[in-house]
C-alpha cells in the first residue's frame, strides 16, 4: 500500500505524508476530470490494469483505487 501511496503522491505532486488510504480524490487541489483521467492512465501503465471509464467514475478515494488494482 505504501508504494501505491507514494506513487499517488507523485502523480498529484504532494508530499506522501499528506495522504493516506482514506484520502478522497476530491481533496486534491488540482482535482478535476483531466486529473482523474491522468491518474487512471498512470495507474493503468504502472500496474498493468485496465480500468474502464464506468469503473473509474465510481472510484472516490485512494483506498477504492487500491482495492480495484488488487482485485484486477
Model-derived features: positions:
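Generic non-transmembrane alpha-helix signal with a bias for helix starts/N-cap capping motifs
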Residues: 1-2, 37, 62
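Thiotemplate assembly-line natural product biosynthesis machinery
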Residues: 1-17, 71-72
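Phosphopantetheine carrier-protein modules
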Residues: 11-30, 47-58
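Phosphopantetheine-attachment site and its flanking helix in carrier
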Residues: 27-45
Amino acid at each position: 500500500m505504501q508504494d501505491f501511496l507514494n506513487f499517488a503522491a507523485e502523480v498529484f505532486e504532494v508530499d506522501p505524508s499528506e495522504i493516506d488510504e482514506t484520502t478522497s480524490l476530491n481533496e486534491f487541489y488540482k482535482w478535476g476530470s483531466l486529473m482523474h483521467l491522468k491518474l487512471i492512465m498512470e495507474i493503468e501503465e504502472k500496474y498493468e490494469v485496465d480500468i474502464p471509464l464506468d469503473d473509474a467514475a465510481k472510484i472516490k478515494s485512494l483506498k477504492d483505487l487500491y482495492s480495484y488494482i488488487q482485485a484486477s
